[in-house]
Amino acid sequence: ISNVTLDQYGKMLLGTNVQSAYTTISEMGIDIFGLNCSTGPIEMEPSVQWLNDQKHKPLLVVPNAGMPENEGGQAVYKMTPEKMASALDSFIKEYRQINIIGGCCGTNPEHIAQLRKVIDQQKKD
């Protein structure tokens, strides 16, 4: 498994875009390519869509609970468990290459519990 962290513009810290990172890393014998941390599902979606369209590797998607906001010098994540679960529900339905999904910064057990409900409901459907 290889993960990269992208900003809201789909770029890594030194400016590499997701397309270049994926093209390089996917040829190194990895089984799964992933995006984690740094952004929420909304900002991550264009990169997830592009990766899904490649249909070459299974995907790991682990966004934050939205973009962090600075409040008194502290990073605060305001995406509710329900809103995040709804966004990830759409990801699971639309992007079939996703094999691993979860939450990173700003998530808590309630975020994961709501995501679990979404996954369980999709299994029933």
Give names to the regions the model predicted.
Residues 1-125:
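Domain-level signal for soluble alpha/beta catalytic cores
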